């Protein structure tokens, strides 16, 4: 398979997984709408694709790595939502579309970003079961460091 084909296939895996992540979890539809608005807004998906390709290069199963790769994308999206807020960069557009806080309001945007950060760890805990508990915990700790004050 050529690299471009592999990249497209990985992106399709990520898109499909992200779209299915929050199905049936809609006690607050407005919050989930805001989360999905930014999560599915497009982009190159370079972070999850790099995670999947690293897994593949090390001889791992890409389907096992998919929840972890998508968790990384959730963290990235949360950071973009928060970065666009009026108290930060106050951006009106992201990828040619109105930013989350322009569509859903500042309070909902903050909650959507927070919820995506939390959802990243929930995704690892619920769907990362193909790994041993020890390895999933190590991956969670690594993501926590990268997403926290010692990382981003």
Task: List the model feature ranges, each with a label.
Residues 1-22:
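N-terminal amphipathic/basic leader segments beginning at the initiator methionine
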